[in-house]
Swiss-Prot record:
Name of the protein: Small ribosomal subunit protein uS10
SMART domains tied to this protein: Ribosomal_S10
GO BP: any one term: translation
Keyword Ribonucleoprotein: yes
Protein source organism: Picosynechococcus sp. (strain ATCC 27264 / PCC 7002 / PR-6)
Annotated InterPro entries: Ribosomal_uS10, Ribosomal_uS10_CS, Ribosomal_uS10_dom, Ribosomal_uS10_dom_sf
Cited NCBIfam families: PRK00596.1 (NF001861), rpsJ_bact (TIGR01049)
């Protein structure tokens, strides 16, 4: 049986702000759909929580502490059958600075 290897672009997005991440995902999916590529996603991945424990007092009172946390929200978008138009449109897409994008071909 001959199997055809299907071309796929996998885009991983990370951000601290969930709303910013969702708007970026919408822009990417709309761009892919406009260029006749099939976009699957955004698929939400588990949110990573990082908690920092800091002493409130600069000198003593170790009982008094404060907790800070950062939440990293993550999404995956798969684009199947991308054309050269799709890749050019994704390269020209203007996304916010607070979103980390990782692309795998």
């Amino acid at each position: 049986m001959a199997t055809l290897q299907q071309q796929k672009i996998r885009i991983r997005l990370k951000a601290f702000d969930r709303r910013l991440l969702d708007t970026s995902c919408e822009k990417i999916v709309d761009t892919a759909n406009r260029t006749n590529a099939t976009a699957i996603g955004p698929i939400p991945l588990p949110t990573k929580r990082k908690i920092y424990c800091v002493l409130r007092s600069p000198h003593v009172d170790k009982d008094s502490r404060e907790h800070f946390e950062t939440r990293t929200h993550r999404r995956i978008i798969d684009i199947y059958q991308p054309s050269s138009k799709t890749i050019d449109a994704l390269m020209k897409l203007d996304l916010p600075a607070g979103v980390d994008i990782e692309v795998k071909l």
